[in-house]
Design a protein with these regions (language model features):
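Short glycine-biased active-site loop of nucleotidyltransferases that positions the nucleotide triphosphate
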Residues: 30, 71-77
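N-terminal accessory segments
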Residues: 1-34, 53-61, 66-68
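Short beta-strand-to-turn element immediately C-terminal to the catalytic PLP-Schiff-base lysine
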Residues: 73-75, 104, 140-141
Length: 142
């Protein structure tokens, strides 16, 4: 496969996803490795587009939630795209009588607990920095 660069990747994104481009910052650093591009998608469709285009351009992607535990696991030698999921922070469905809730990956544990508290419920897990730790990150790390 021909090696393509991140500039071509950015040009190929839909206008709505280009609006979610940000400059990489210290927030995106993983053990001193910084991406070239940072994206903050607003929907699962935008995540799908991001990953599809990144694959097409042979780019390495790292998902980032609350960025609370990025140093855990194998250190990347490089990555091209930071896929920041903290804008995906909605409750999709809540059925208190069934004790079930469906949420997006970027919702923080703190925000989820506040939502559940409205019905005198809670999620029986804890995580450091609950106001920043996302459900997606907590589940990924364990």
């Amino acid at each position: 496969m021909e090696q393509k660069n991140t500039a071509d990747f950015v040009k190929s994104l839909s206008p709505s996803l280009k609006d979610e481009l940000t400059s990489p910052s210290d927030y995106h650093l993983i053990d001193d490795v910084s991406p070239t591009v940072a994206l903050s998608p607003l929907s699962t469709e935008q995540i799908s587009e991001s990953l599809s285009k990144a694959s097409e351009y042979d780019l390495k992607v790292c998902p980032i939630g609350g960025a609370t535990r990025l140093a855990i696991g194998n250190k990347p030698t490089q990555y091209d795209v930071a896929l920041t999921l903290n804008k995906l922070d909605k409750v999709i469905d809540c059925k208190p009588s069934d004790l079930s809730i469906t949420v997006q990956a970027g919702i923080t544990l703190g925000k989820l607990q506040k939502q559940l508290q409205k019905n005198n419920q809670f999620l029986p897990i804890s995580a450091p920095l609950a106001q920043r730790s996302t459900i997606g990150g907590i589940l990924a790390i364990g």
